[in-house]
UniProtKB/Swiss-Prot annotation:
One of its GO terms (molecular function) is protein-containing complex binding. Alters PTPRF cellular localization and induces PTPRF clustering. May regulate the disassembly of focal adhesions. May localize receptor-like tyrosine phosphatases type 2A at specific sites on the plasma membrane, possibly regulating their interaction with the extracellular environment and their association with substrates. In neuronal cells, is a scaffolding protein in the dendritic spines which acts as immobile postsynaptic post able to recruit KIF1A-driven dense core vesicles to dendritic spines. InterPro entries: Liprin, Liprin-alpha_SAM_rpt_1, Liprin-alpha_SAM_rpt_2, Liprin-alpha_SAM_rpt_3, SAM, SAM/pointed_sf. This is Liprin-alpha-2. It comes from Mus musculus. PROSITE patterns: SAM_DOMAIN. The modification Phosphoserine is found at S236, S239, S687, S689, S817, S820. It is found in: Cytoplasm; Cell surface; Cell projection, Dendritic spine.
Amino acid sequence: MMCEVMPTINEDTPMSQRGSQSSGSDSDSHFEQLMVNMLDERDRLLDTLRETQESLSLAQQRLQDVIYDRDSLQRQLNSALPQDIESLTGGLTGSKGADPPEFAALTKELNACREQLLEKEEEISELKAERNNTRLLLEHLECLVSRHERSLRMTVVKRQAQSPSGVSSEVEVLKALKSLFEHHKALDEKVRERLRVSLERVSALEEELAAANQEIVALREQNVHIQRKMVSSEGSTESEHLEGMEAGQKVHEKRLSNGSIDSTDDTSQIVELQELLEKQNYEMAQMKERLTALSSRVGEVEQEAETARKDLIKTEEMNTKYQRDIREAMAQKEDMEERITTLEKRYLSAQRESTSIHDMNDKLENELANKEAILRQMEEKNRQLQERLELAEQKLQQTMRKAETLPEVEAELAQRIAALTKAEERHGNIEERMRHLEGQLEEKNQELQRARQREKMNEEHNKRLSDTVDRLLTESNERLQLHLKERMAALEEKNVLIQESENFRKNLEESLHDKVSLAEEIEKLRSELDQMKMRTGSLIEPTISRTHIDTSTELRYSVGSLVDSQSDYRTTKVIRRPRRGRMGVRRDEPKVKSLGDHEWNRTQQIGVLGSHPFESDTEMSDIDDDDRETIFSSMDLLSPSGHSDAQTLAMMLQEQLDAINKEIRLIQEEKESTELRAEEIENRVASVSLEGLNLARVHPGTSITASVTASSLASSSPPSGHSTPKLTPRSPAREMDRMGVMTLPSDLRKHRRKIAVVEEDGREDKATIKCETSPPPTPRAVRMTHTLPSSYHNDARSSLSASLEPDSLGLGSANSSQDSLHKAPKKKGIKSSIGRLFGKKEKARLGQLRGFMETEAAAQESLGLGKLGTQAEKDRRLKKKHELLEEARRKGLPFAQWDGPTVVAWLELWLGMPAWYVAACRANVKSGAIMSALSDTEIQREIGISNPLHRLKLRLAIQEMVSLTSPSAPPTSRTPSGNVWVTHEEMENLTAPAKTKESEEGSWAQCPVFLQTLAYGDMNHEWIGNEWLPSLGLPQYRSYFMECLVDARMLDHLTKKDLRVHLKMVDSFHRTSLQYGIMCLKRLNYDRKELERRREASQHEIKDVLVWSNDRVIRWIQAIGLREYANNILESGVHGSLIALDENFDYSSLALLLQIPTQNTQARQILEREYNNLLALGTERRLDESDDKNFRRGSTWRRQFPPREVHGISMMPGSSETLPAGFRLTTTSGQSRKMTTDVASSRLQRLDNSTVRTYSC
């Protein structure tokens, strides 16, 4: 076998050989190619190792066969050679010995041994070649690993740092290499042990060869002695010579195959024998040489094994190195292990349940053993009773013979006959009890099988859940990576904007200084004007005084007229203050300017300390706090003391994904709002710097207003979210003073007017989206909807009226996260990578901004933004899901146009699907069109629903929703209002005859007729298992119905196979009982409230037996005087629908189920009389004229259930267009039904002969 050398792996590209630094993606691709090559090489090595092991096992088997043949030949040789020698000596001396052996046969056997030895040598050489090949492969693999050790270690660390969610393929490769080396080490030890055994056998063979050589030497000596005797016996008698000749002739006849023996020459025979002995000696010597060669080769094999062991030691050293790397990688694997531990804890809990089930099984087996012993005792008693019966019969025959003469014996015989009848009754009771015990035994066995099936299903669900969790985690990791890149890009852009805003601020400060100097010049000019007016005459004095009053008034109202009017800032009046001098105005200007400088310095500190120039720092801090709470809450959910069910885990994963999506959406919106804010700042700076100077030259009072406006702009423009003003009494007036007289460009004013109109809109469900997509609504930006008026009184009024807008528009300054704070308590996600990245910076910023955080906390309290508890969070999620369904109802969307969250809410709220199915649908189904297009096999493959009844449930629900939400549904299948959803008012119209029709619009999720159980889950699988089945007297099937999620919609679609296989309803009577229960629901149009109302009405009266439950039937049996037999129909399937609708179910069937003995005629007569009375008073069944014992159904039953409904499809007008083939619906038609109650008749009158499709969920 040739030694195949593995091809080398191209580890480095030409770029890397030249030493150039390649990009991260190229190195990753090369490394992945390298790992793929190593994995392929590992597979090849495993294949060669497997083949080598097989060949080694074959060689060992062959070696054992050769050893066995050699031992047998050796024994034959040892046993044959002495006899041959003795026979030869006897023949030569003329004695009457045995015939000489067949040396030709020995030579043939010797040749066969030689050929077998050659074959074994070839096999040994092949094994050596294979072992050499394996050693070369291992050396090649070791070279590869040592060559790429550094790159492997770096990439393992890099991969683990990037994706902490799972274990990389490199770790798996290292583990595989370690297992391969350990396997080769164990194999080498096995080979060494076998070599030691073979060497021991070779030494034993050498000893045997030495003994054989000694025997050959002794034979030679005997031959020499025989030759001497032959020389001395030449003068023997002729008769002895003739006998020798005959012996020689015999030898010649036997050795004729050699062709070298002369029958007349004894010496030639001896020579021949000597030659044969020499040949055999030569062959034995060759055998010995070959054995020595074999021993030398075995030594070589041992040396090779030693080298292989050294190689294995080297590989073990490499493995230790890799194990160190693996330990480093295992530190990153702890997160996954924690989640695995939670799953393991759940598995342990399931295992504990299985152990408890096993214990219960053992108890049941012990009880069964006891019952079997009781049964044996009862059988023995039965035999004794039978023997006594036979003896009694014999005695009866004897007494019958004596009956004519002994009349007294007849009385005694009658007594004995009565005793025998009693014994027979007891025997019948015992047989019935035995049958009952056998039935219980079968039920226990079935329960055991069901428990095992449930355990298997739990394992499958756990596996699916772990797969879904892994897939969701990988997807969230990818989204977080993209999120991080986009956030970093936004950071760079915002840093550029901050620098530009710094430049704008410097320009503003310069313009402010210029305006101060201009104000000083204006005051000088005014003082000169005053002097000139004093010098002028008395004729011009009134006009000048008026102008002075006007200018001073303008000056007052432009700067500080509203600063101290905090008490009446909510009114539309402007209260004038006493006049102040020019020094008062100058005192106010530094205040405003210092306020702007203070704000700007604080903003600089925030930007430098945080290096995180977001506009929504408060949002990030709030999200950080919320995320911190959510992390601990999610860890509580994962802990064993918290909620460990699958639904909570799926809900938590969905919250994490929603939080990630929300953060991505917020980043995009912040980017857009940042761009809009930059344009706004540029426009403001340009308008203030250009218009302010012109206004200063023309109107002196207006220049001061412009300065105040610029200072207010400077105080409100920092991008940090912590610049929210404190809610003090002076803040509204000061805010109006700063904001009320500002001029904006015309296009920006129009944009602000649009924002104000949008904010005043009453659609609360879209408010947050509009606020986030539009620029942030600061108080100044929202209120500034007017240009500079001619009268400052009107300006003040407009500012005051604008200040009375809702608090949501006036509480923040430049805080774009104010709207996102509205959404903060709605959904709390996990702490994202952005929160981790900037958490420390925000903490450093919190130390300096504690005062601003207090005001923000006050604003949050005023807006109701407190942290919600766990129950409130669940209620909010539930309300959000109801709102999704309500929105779909309000828009009238077909099912194909529903989005993914609406479909998931529909599955969870209305359908009641398990949490793992909901999680799988959330991951795989993104719209109603995808859900409605899924076939049965796709539902099983994509969503993982393996139970056929679960698939039936989902398929029927999808078909129903598609047909109900279809815009092409005919009017006959709709409600009187023409809407496919029945409103609350229409429901009242259907149930209350005195009420008139109300509005068509209503809440779809509150009270629809056909979907009332859909919205509230009234007739879902919980109701079927917990209430309906016990009311039928079939509570033993509750667990199966609950496992299969059987709801009212599925009842009419269950086949016999489903009942027998999936629901374990093997008893035909129980299936019949279930069928009549379904018929009862059909007659009530699947109306649970009507069913409960009629049951409540017939609780204490013998009427309306159709709706009687099993408990009501038991109470009726107790009331008629059969209390001792009443409990026998528990779990028997006897209920009112069976009595009222099954014409084959008569009093004898009920007596059999009640286990009333046939001898108890009195109880049976009571039952017959009361049963007939029950049928006459509470059902539509009547006694037939021909036979009093048989009953028949009334004509109403035959009309209400036509023959074609027996096959499972009830056709009705208007339903064939919207419903698929085989989809069964019930009809409620005024012409085809006669309802007994007034409510039902009034409902039919208001339906106007239209059909209402009713199904539950």
